[in-house]
Amino acid sequence: MLRPVSIDDLISDTVPAKKPRFLIKKRTFPQPEEEEASKALSHTVIKRKDNYRNLDEDELYEEQVSNEPDDLLFLARKSADLLKKRQNEDESIVDNYLGKHWSEKKYEEMSTRDWRILSEDFNISSKGGTVEKPLRNWHELKLIPEDLLNIITNDLHYNEPTSIQRSTIPNVINNRDFIGVASTGSGKTLAFLLPILIKLHGIPPLNSITKHDGPLALVLAPTRELAQQIQHEGQSITKLWKRPCNIVSIVGGHSLEEISANLRDGCDILVATPGRLLDCLDSHLLFLKQVNTLVLDEADKMIDFGFEDQLTTILAKTETISNRQTMMFTATFSPTIEKVANGYLKKPSYVTVGGEESKPKIKQIVRYVPDEEEKLKILVKDFLPNYKAPIIIFINYKRTADWLFDKLREARFRATTLHGSKSQEQREHSLSLLRNGKVDILIATDVAGRGIDIPNVSLVVNLQFPKSFDSFVHRVGRTGRAGKTGTALTFLTEEEDHSAMAKLFDYVKKNDFTGENYISKEAMSKYNVDKSSYKPIII
């Protein structure tokens, strides 16, 4: 006979009332790690529950104190493991919500978002093909051999790579052809020299046989001044390097006999202007049998100067070299440049360095001073003593250069001149004096000054306004380079062309990247400039 149903039985067998559907919490299926943590937690609680049954209050307190830290540590470790996995899968919760910057992370912790922010920080953009991630610093990934790294950082004090260096070096080291669009003064010379030297690091030095087969690397530049500047910068590294490395330049102004003597012992890196290089090739002074790296520096200027045919001829002469790697640097990417790139570069990585960094940080000052002696007085009193060397003063005529040189020497300023009447040897000597700090001021005409690449120019002076507006832009561009701030002082007289003045004032207005550009009241009045658009100069 069945026993009567008790009240307790009824209570225990009652099916719990269901919650309304909208109150039921959606079930989520735990990941294996979560199940493991859950089981461990459950096991811990059950074990402790069993242990507590027959303990008095004092024993229970002691058991709690002895077990709780271990349980919490176990749970903390499990939680940390789960969080780390989720962070890796979802580009890091901490990054997205707490804003941990890429510079605070190790390389392997970098997410896609971090690389995007790094590129934005340094104004680097890319398109087409595969592009390697930019360098975060010189030391990471050990891309640069230790001996070269010590020269770059300790001896030459290049503390951080520039934007173009960050993007060029990883791509070139991975044997990609490369196109870099960057302004002059962005540090691109080191950007292509360093990968060349890294490649040479793993190649035996030239011997009595291979030295006759031509250079291992060829750099083409539009002007002799730029070619010599590249040679000078390369030699500043190689003279400190244990590996023998000969850098030779071939430019106009040097006889074929002199060039032949320089090439007698062979050269690892040859820097040349297109026309003079073809002269040497036609005269069989050298061959291009073993060029494994070809650099076109300032390719847009080479096209502008009419070197397109010469350029394509040289490219064709090295086309048969199967392992040739080509780098092209240009400030603009015109259809002509694109045609050359499509014809001679193989699936290149394409990087543009632009944005705020490429905008020249130049404070422009325009003054109307018709009297030459008054210009000199303002220059000597208000400007030259207040700016660090090097300083460049542009003039239009040789006689003005000689007159100004004498006046500055009387005022105890150290200066040198650069103009068309000087020989190539004299020009090189003047530039050497400036670069080595033996003089502070260079007085130059446009013809002589074209293509000169002098770093860290603090002040450019247009003592006489140039005959073309393009020359003015070129002059002013000698300062405010590679992220540094510079000043350009322009003197006007009553003889200036009004259409050129309209261009000048418009240029000064639109290129006020420092917010400090000024035009004097006298200049505005003389050339009928809208006074509401410009601030008067205060000196």
Curated annotation (Swiss-Prot):
Binding site for ATP: A182, S183, T184, G185, S186, G187, K188, T189
Pfam families: DEAD, Helicase_C
Reaction(s) catalysed by this chain's protein: ATP + H2O = ADP + phosphate + H(+)
Top class in the EC scheme: hydrolase
Compartment(s) of residence: Cytoplasm; Nucleus
Keyword Cytoplasm: yes
Domain Helicase ATP-binding positions: 169-351
Protein name: Pre-mRNA-splicing ATP-dependent RNA helicase PRP28
Phylogenetic classification of the source organism: Eukaryota, Fungi, Dikarya, Ascomycota, Saccharomycotina
